């Protein structure tokens, strides 16, 4: 049997496509699936490729050159643990296991520590781009032992997407243990925010301005030529022009307004809460999906709860431009929050995350790829210790020029009774972050009153408690 250079466990669409991607770069790839018929199906479909068909884990491991490089593309959670448990007795010290699933970062940290005791290297790798990206080039976020990553880097750099701006591969070492999967988690949280902001923009254009799908599609097409140039804007304009293949009209109008999720947005918000990082926009985008699932209750509520009538009579062209500015402004708030979370996590877990590089490897292959990511890289190149993107000169200038549009759009939506939780959250975050003084002094006084939680003073150092129960 030919010695394979790389192995992939899991022949669902992502695993199959990654295996084919690696093979297309000149490598021989061993493939294995728990259900042998699936492995045979993939092998038969691609007999002209340098794939090694294996029917048992023993055969799979035996087919690989040492140190073995094995990528797990199985369901996150218990299935990954079970696969590792089955593989472990067959591996030698120095072998490398790569988890390319949508894994929660604490699981990656645990597995990394457990496998290190056995001398097995473990690389948790976030993979973004979906099934097409897996085949043609994803964005990849690996974390684990640096020396182990160096052994897989040549393959990863070949299979990763290449940024159109400079041809650089969209993969880089993120840091120790769970760093890669953490970065992918935040990527997914930002993705939630981007999608909700676009949805709210669409809703305003449709329900407030009364525009047709064709008109909205043309607007998104124009927006994709400027600052908002991104994959999600690109696919939105494609979605809006597609007709229903089972009837009349547009397919988007026939899709039930209940948004699903796989939990990664929730993970991002949970981690932010654990770290004490404000992440309001991304968290609102998660809640927006949740409330969308309450369809039956919303239908009932729509019949009994009153709201204002939508009666717009202004300049539509002017409002469209304000919505564009509000969308870009709010997108900046989302990324500022996400990168602030990455900074706090990096400090907490001692990862030394490369913030500018993270923005670079998101420029192609992934769902949130966007032109403005270069502005983020530039910001961190100028100041690697930048506390928040909003403090960078470029973003200071944009927010100064665009904030009025956001305030107008939020006011318009509120007066029309149109929910825009992420737009509203964006301007509130901005105003909170730029406020030298917030009313938290009153909250701290209340906490001290009922729970003797103490407080600090503005005029002198120390921790204080006031005797609230003594008459003044």
Curated annotation (Swiss-Prot):
Which branch of life, at top level?
A: Bacteria
Recorded GO terms, molecular function?
A: NADP binding; phosphogluconate dehydrogenase (decarboxylating) activity
Q: Which residue positions are annotated as catalytic?
A: 184, 191
Per UniProt, where does substrate bind? 102, 128-130, 187-188, 192, 262, 289, 447, 453
**What keywords does the record list, in alphabetical order?**
Gluconate utilization, NADP, Oxidoreductase, Pentose shunt
Gene3D superfamilies in the cross-refs: 6-Phosphogluconate Dehydrogenase, domain 3, N-(1-d-carboxylethyl)-l-norvaline Dehydrogenase, domain 2, NAD(P)-binding Rossmann-like Domain
User: Which residues span the membrane?
Assistant: none
Q: What EC number(s) are associated with this protein in UniProt? A: 1.1.1.44
Alphabetized InterPro entries for the sequence: 6-PGluconate_DH-like_C_sf, 6PGD_dom2, 6PGDH_C, 6PGDH_Gnd/GntZ, 6PGDH_NADP-bd, 6PGdom_BS, NAD(P)-bd_dom_sf, Pgluconate_DH
From its record, what is one biological process in GO terms?
Answer: organic acid catabolic process
Q: Pathway, according to UniProt?
A: Carbohydrate degradation; pentose phosphate pathway; D-ribulose 5-phosphate from D-glucose 6-phosphate (oxidative stage): step 3/3
Residue numbers binding NADP(+): 10-15, 33-35, 74-76, 102
Q: Which residues form the signal peptide?
A: none
Catalyses: 6-phospho-D-gluconate + NADP(+) = D-ribulose 5-phosphate + CO2 + NADPH
Q: Does the record bear Transmembrane helix in its keywords?
A: no
Any one Pfam family match given in the protein's UniProt record, by short name? 6PGD
- Role description: Catalyzes the oxidative decarboxylation of 6-phosphogluconate to ribulose 5-phosphate and CO(2), with concomitant reduction of NADP to NADPH.
Q: Which family does it belong to?
A: Belongs to the 6-phosphogluconate dehydrogenase family.
What is annotated about its quaternary structure and interactions?
Answer: Homodimer.
In Swiss-Prot or TrEMBL terms, this protein is called 6-phosphogluconate dehydrogenase, decarboxylating
Instruction: Report which gene this protein is encoded by.
Output: gnd
């Amino acid at each position: 049997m030919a010695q394979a250079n790389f192995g992939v466990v899991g022949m669902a669409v992502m695993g199959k496509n990654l295996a084919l991607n690696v093979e297309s770069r000149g490598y021989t790839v061993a493939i294995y699936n728990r259900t042998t018929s699936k492995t045979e199906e993939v092998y038969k479909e691609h007999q002209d490729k340098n794939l090694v068909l294996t029917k048992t884990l023993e055969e799979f491991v035996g087919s690989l050159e040492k140190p073995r490089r094995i990528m797990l593309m199985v369901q996150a959670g218990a299935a990954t643990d079970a696969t590792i448990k089955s593989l472990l007795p067959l591996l030698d010290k120095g072998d490398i296991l790569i988890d390319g699933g949508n894994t929660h970062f604490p699981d990656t940290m645990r597995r990394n520590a457990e496998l290190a005791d056995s001398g097995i290297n473990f690389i948790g790798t976030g993979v973004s781009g979906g099934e097409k990206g897996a085949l043609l080039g994803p964005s990849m976020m690996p974390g684990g032992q640096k020396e182990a990553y160096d052994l897989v880097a040549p393959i990863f750099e070949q299979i990763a997407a290449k940024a159109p701006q400079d041809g650089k591969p969209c993969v880089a070492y993120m840091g120790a243990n769970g760093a890669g999967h953490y970065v992918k988690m935040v990527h997914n949280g930002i993705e939630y925010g981007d999608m909700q902001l676009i949805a709210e923009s669409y809703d305003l254009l449709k329900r407030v301005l009364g525009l047709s799908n064709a008109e909205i599609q043309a607007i998104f097409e124009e927006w994709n030529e400027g600052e908002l140039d991104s994959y999600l804007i690109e696919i939105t304009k494609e979605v809006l022009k597609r007709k229903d293949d089972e009837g009349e009209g547009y397919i988007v109008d026939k899709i039930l307004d209940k948004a699903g999720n796989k939990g990664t947005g929730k993970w991002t918000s949970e981690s932010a809460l654990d770290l004490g990082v404000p992440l309001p926009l991304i968290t609102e985008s998660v809640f927006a999906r949740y409330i969308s699932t309450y369809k039956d209750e919303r239908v009932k509520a729509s019949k009994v709860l009153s709201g204002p009538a939508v009666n717009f009579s202004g300049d539509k062209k002017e409002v469209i431009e304000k919505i564009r500015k509000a969308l870009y402004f709010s997108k900046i708030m989302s990324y500022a929050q996400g990168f602030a979370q990455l900074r706090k996590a990096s400090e907490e877990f001692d990862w030394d995350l490369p913030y500018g590089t993270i923005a670079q490897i998101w420029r192609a292959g992934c769902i949130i790829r966007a032109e403005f990511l270069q502005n983020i890289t530039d910001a961190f190149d100028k100041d690697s210790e930048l506390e928040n993107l909003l403090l960078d000169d470029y973003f200071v200038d944009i927010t100064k020029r665009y904030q009025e549009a956001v305030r107008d759009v939020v006011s318009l939506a509120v007066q029309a009774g149109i929910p825009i939780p992420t737009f509203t959250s964006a301007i509130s975050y901005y105003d909170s972050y730029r406020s030298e003084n917030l009313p938290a002094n009153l909250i701290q006084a209340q906490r001290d009153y009922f729970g003797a939680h103490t407080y600090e003073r503005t005029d002198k150092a120390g921790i204080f408690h006031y005797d609230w129960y003594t008459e003044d």
